[in-house]
Amino acid sequence: MTLKVPCPQCQKTVVWQASSEFRPFCSKRCQLIDLGEWAEESHKISQNIQVDTVLSEEMLDAMEDEFLLNNKFFVEPE
């Protein structure tokens, strides 16, 4: 079964598949309109992020090291 979703900008039907280059948008135009709306802060995340735990420098360093080990496409700055 093929999944079809409405374009968030114009509501045109978009087939959700790997070959749909601009998904969930129907076109580059709709994708850029949406990006512009985010840049102008017409769209925003409505709630502040709640942080339950304060991370120490050591914890942040360990998380960064683990991330870099698992994501080989990132290069550490020299």
Swiss-Prot record:
Answer yes or no on keyword Phosphoprotein: no
Superkingdom as given in the UniProt entry: Bacteria
Binding annotation for Zn(2+):
C7, C10, C26, C30
Q: List the disulfide bonds.
A: none
Q: Which keywords fit this entry according to its UniProt record?
A: Metal-binding, Zinc
For biological process, the GO terms are: regulation of DNA-templated transcription
Does the keyword field hold NADP?
no
TM helices/strands, residue ranges: none
Required co-factor(s) are: Zn(2+)
- Cofactor: bound how, per the entry note? Binds 1 zinc ion.
Parts forming coiled coils: none
Please give the Gene Ontology molecular function terms for this protein.
DNA topoisomerase type II (double strand cut, ATP-hydrolyzing) inhibitor activity; zinc ion binding
> Family, per the entry?
Belongs to the DNA gyrase inhibitor YacG family.
Q: What does this protein do?
A: Inhibits all the catalytic activities of DNA gyrase by preventing its interaction with DNA. Acts by binding directly to the C-terminal domain of GyrB, which probably disrupts DNA binding by the gyrase.
State whether it acts alone or in a complex, and with which partners, per the record: Interacts with GyrB.
Q: Which PANTHER family match?
A: DNA GYRASE INHIBITOR YACG
Instruction: Supply the name of the protein.
Output: DNA gyrase inhibitor YacG
**Native organism:** Colwellia psychrerythraea (strain 34H / ATCC BAA-681) (Vibrio psychroerythus)
